[in-house]
């Protein structure tokens, strides 16, 4: 949902042979200004993707949990799943909304677990204490993987099961 003149596009279709998956990546606008309305852009993209598939997954990259939740409710029953990204902390609210859309506010991150957003914790602590810091450096601690597995019924496009995962 960047405006015209920016390269790339934030959606596409993955052809798996027996079925197709529509994938959309959108940016929220709360504390991340400068983007087109993700709700309107989603409406437009979904109309196009629905011509080819009922399975549509949305990565909603946003800061505010309320904006993510509102987006999930707005598109409940319209898309298969909405998962939030950006905050790097997996939330404990994975659910299937009443219209059949799988939802989680944030899927978490993959990277060094003993870190702040993947960065050496001392650097981030210094930033908060002093108002500035040195260059960000990736933490050199054991990694972990977080995410969410959505099981989607291919004909209806509805989520039938949702399982957050953490692998250490």
Describe each region flagged by the PLM.
Residues 1-168:
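Acidic, metal/ion-coordinating pockets
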């Amino acid at each position: 949902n960047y405006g015209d003149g920016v390269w790339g596009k934030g959606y596409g279709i993955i052809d798996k042979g027996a079925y197709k998956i529509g994938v959309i990546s959108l940016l929220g606008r709360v504390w991340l200004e400068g983007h087109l309305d993700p709700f309107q852009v989603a409406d437009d993209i979904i109309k196009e993707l629905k011509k080819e598939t009922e399975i549509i997954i949305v990565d909603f990259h946003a800061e505010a949990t309320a904006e993510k939740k509102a987006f999930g409710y707005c598109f409940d029953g319209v898309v298969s799943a909405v998962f939030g990204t950006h905050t790097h902390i997996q939330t404990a609210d994975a659910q299937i909304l009443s219209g059949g859309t799988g939802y989680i506010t944030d899927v978490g991150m993959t990277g060094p677990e003993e870190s702040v957003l993947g960065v050496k914790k001392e650097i981030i602590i210094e930033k908060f204490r002093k108002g500035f810091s040195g260059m960000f450096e990736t933490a050199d601690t054991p990694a972990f993987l977080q995410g969410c597995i959505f099981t989607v019924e291919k004909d209806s496009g509805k989520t039938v099961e949702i399982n957050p995962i953490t692998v250490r």
